[in-house]
């Protein structure tokens, strides 16, 4: 009997071993077929063990393939064959270019625990076959093009810990059975078309930490049950149609770091239990119907960096206790019914960057201590009842980008100290007050200012000629004052509508219709006066000429000697770079197939030599780094490491890893990073042909290579496709410009700087103008009035790039006239009596009729993109479609 038992066991053992070998051969054949279809980098069937291939892990004794990670490889093709790897437990296909329907055969991967198909272009419905994956713990199909409802067949996935379906076109309601997923920690379904109520059953999910449902059409109340288990850390419900009150139970979740419930229809008061949430970092409840007083309990949330209660019905005074929030960076209380004085308690805050108290009923005076806040960039106090003088200490706000004091009851004169605010860029608004006296000439020092409004005051005297120093000025308004004399000859003034100067009875000259009435005799006298001065100057000049000539020769010799010494010193410095190289705090290369080729120490060393610098942009300088392996990478050195990066280093790294999986043919993704001291270096693929700015505006210096129209159109389409993809995955670019349209070895356009919108504040999902003002010439006009970087704003900036491509002109040129940029110059062509053909680069448009016809069609697209009204601009997806149609014009 024993013999027979042993024999049976041996036979079974041999069979199992045979089956194991057969399974291994089957997996290997499947992987070879997958590689043939997808072309996976680093996979080779030349006798190597497939278990060592990049992105693969096998089980015990290299038995079966249990993990397949092809994330971020920009792969295309059919992925159905993957379903033949029946022992898979972990499948990550995120960040590729896979399209079509998700294979239903994935439902046969019965061992699967982790499935990530996000950041692709899958279409159709969510396969009901996923309901067969009973062991699934993580399920992510976000940022695709999926439609339909969340299928009920998924309700049996009781082990789910992460359930992410965001960024699709899903409709229907959130299934009630989500509340039965007892292990659920993360549930995200934002940016879909979901309707109905948030299921009360979600309150039964004891492990829920993150709930993000923003940008849907959800209705009903916020279920109080979601707070009662006490583990919730992030709640994002913005941009829905939610009603009712914020439940008092919110205070149970002491670990909550972010509450975002703005853009809903919520009512009632903010519960005082909010003070129990000691870890709260962000609280956004703007654009609701909340009422009552702003509760002082917010002061107990010591980590709070953003408090946004704008556009509600709050009344009462601003709690002085808010001054205890030493980490507060943005305080936005605009559009309420707050009264009383501006509390002095928080005016010494070392971190406050934005203070928006506009459109309330505040009274009292502007505290002179207001500018003791060293980081303040945005000060909005307009539309209140503030009285008194503008304090002279306002000049201490040297970092301000925007100052809004309009529609108050301010008196006195405009302090000349405003001229010290040299960073003022977006707007200076002093309109609708009772200011008197003359305009201080010091305003002319504000050479970055885009918008100036001093209308509807009691200002007297003439407009100072020194205001011509405001070289960036686009919009001005001097109307309804007591100004007199001629309007200075300054292009921004003459290009402004006459309404900007009306209501000043004694003001004359263009753009006003009233002439200043100078006589010919006076003109003649002035001419003779000028001639006399010229004669005197000529005599003096001839006497000085000899002296200057001798001096110049001496100086040239001295300068040459100094330069030679400096050059020698620089050589010594560069030779000592290796000895002084700082220690690396953190660093990584995200792509496995590049890790061996990139030396992080060599990366740091390369950025310490000026000879390696390729370019300097709005946020960073770019260096060329040659690795010991011979590989060349581009290294982006951030100009100044943002506070949020240093405070949220782990979040920054996760954000970079996520962005490294953003695979698109027309995007430059980060491939790694290095952090040392307070410096962040971002690694990218080296692109040898520079950027679009160099191609268009410097090619005239290189007549041997001029980009023709087909190449330019291809670049325009590529850049548009890259930007459209960013918008699809809910990323707003912060600096769309021709210098950020980079060119690979085949002159294919790829959009750079995509990570900046996240790295300026990686802990937040939104980008605000308080982080960036953009590149001059590309800034949409509405940014002077709004505080949000938007998709329509990106479209405008892209339109400027397209105009550059069509006209070969820079965004700002002296030829346009002061205060006139490329957009205004193009849109004003008809008023100048010019035809659209005259706007185009004649070197291209006159080559052939076909080229001219395509260029005129593309010009129409550019004009739509640069419409002054954001709502009238097309979406980038539509821009791509229109430009592709241009390519097909016969």
Curated annotation (Swiss-Prot):
<feature type="glycosylation site" description="N-linked (GlcNAc...) asparagine">
    <location>
        <position position="46"/>
    </location>
</feature>
<keyword id="KW-0472">Membrane</keyword>
<protein>
    <recommendedName>
        <fullName>Leucine-rich repeat receptor-like tyrosine-protein kinase PXC3</fullName>
        <ecNumber>2.7.10.1</ecNumber>
    </recommendedName>
</protein>
<feature type="glycosylation site" description="N-linked (GlcNAc...) asparagine">
    <location>
        <position position="140"/>
    </location>
</feature>
<keyword id="KW-0433">Leucine-rich repeat</keyword>
<feature type="topological domain" description="Extracellular">
    <location>
        <begin position="24"/>
        <end position="534"/>
    </location>
</feature>
<feature type="repeat" description="LRR 13">
    <location>
        <begin position="350"/>
        <end position="373"/>
    </location>
</feature>
<feature type="repeat" description="LRR 6">
    <location>
        <begin position="182"/>
        <end position="205"/>
    </location>
</feature>
<keyword id="KW-0067">ATP-binding</keyword>
<feature type="repeat" description="LRR 15">
    <location>
        <begin position="399"/>
        <end position="421"/>
    </location>
</feature>
<feature type="repeat" description="LRR 16">
    <location>
        <begin position="422"/>
        <end position="446"/>
    </location>
</feature>
<dbReference type="InterPro" id="IPR000719">
    <property type="entry name" value="Prot_kinase_dom"/>
</dbReference>
<feature type="repeat" description="LRR 2">
    <location>
        <begin position="86"/>
        <end position="108"/>
    </location>
</feature>
<dbReference type="InterPro" id="IPR001611">
    <property type="entry name" value="Leu-rich_rpt"/>
</dbReference>
<feature type="topological domain" description="Cytoplasmic">
    <location>
        <begin position="556"/>
        <end position="890"/>
    </location>
</feature>
<feature type="binding site">
    <location>
        <begin position="614"/>
        <end position="622"/>
    </location>
    <ligand>
        <name>ATP</name>
    </ligand>
</feature>
<feature type="glycosylation site" description="N-linked (GlcNAc...) asparagine">
    <location>
        <position position="61"/>
    </location>
</feature>
<keyword id="KW-0829">Tyrosine-protein kinase</keyword>
<dbReference type="InterPro" id="IPR011009">
    <property type="entry name" value="Kinase-like_dom_sf"/>
</dbReference>
<keyword id="KW-0547">Nucleotide-binding</keyword>
<dbReference type="InterPro" id="IPR008266">
    <property type="entry name" value="Tyr_kinase_AS"/>
</dbReference>
<feature type="repeat" description="LRR 9">
    <location>
        <begin position="256"/>
        <end position="276"/>
    </location>
</feature>
<dbReference type="InterPro" id="IPR003591">
    <property type="entry name" value="Leu-rich_rpt_typical-subtyp"/>
</dbReference>
<feature type="domain" description="Protein kinase">
    <location>
        <begin position="608"/>
        <end position="886"/>
    </location>
</feature>
<dbReference type="GO" id="GO:0005524">
    <property type="term" value="F:ATP binding"/>
</dbReference>
<keyword id="KW-0812">Transmembrane</keyword>
<feature type="glycosylation site" description="N-linked (GlcNAc...) asparagine">
    <location>
        <position position="276"/>
    </location>
</feature>
<feature type="repeat" description="LRR 11">
    <location>
        <begin position="301"/>
        <end position="325"/>
    </location>
</feature>
<keyword id="KW-0675">Receptor</keyword>
<feature type="glycosylation site" description="N-linked (GlcNAc...) asparagine">
    <location>
        <position position="171"/>
    </location>
</feature>
<feature type="repeat" description="LRR 4">
    <location>
        <begin position="133"/>
        <end position="157"/>
    </location>
</feature>
<keyword id="KW-0325">Glycoprotein</keyword>
<feature type="repeat" description="LRR 7">
    <location>
        <begin position="206"/>
        <end position="229"/>
    </location>
</feature>
<keyword id="KW-0418">Kinase</keyword>
<feature type="repeat" description="LRR 12">
    <location>
        <begin position="326"/>
        <end position="349"/>
    </location>
</feature>
<feature type="glycosylation site" description="N-linked (GlcNAc...) asparagine">
    <location>
        <position position="289"/>
    </location>
</feature>
<dbReference type="GO" id="GO:0005886">
    <property type="term" value="C:plasma membrane"/>
</dbReference>
<keyword id="KW-0677">Repeat</keyword>
<dbReference type="InterPro" id="IPR050647">
    <property type="entry name" value="Plant_LRR-RLKs"/>
</dbReference>
<feature type="repeat" description="LRR 10">
    <location>
        <begin position="278"/>
        <end position="300"/>
    </location>
</feature>
<comment type="similarity">
    <text>Belongs to the protein kinase superfamily. Tyr protein kinase family.</text>
</comment>
<feature type="glycosylation site" description="N-linked (GlcNAc...) asparagine">
    <location>
        <position position="180"/>
    </location>
</feature>
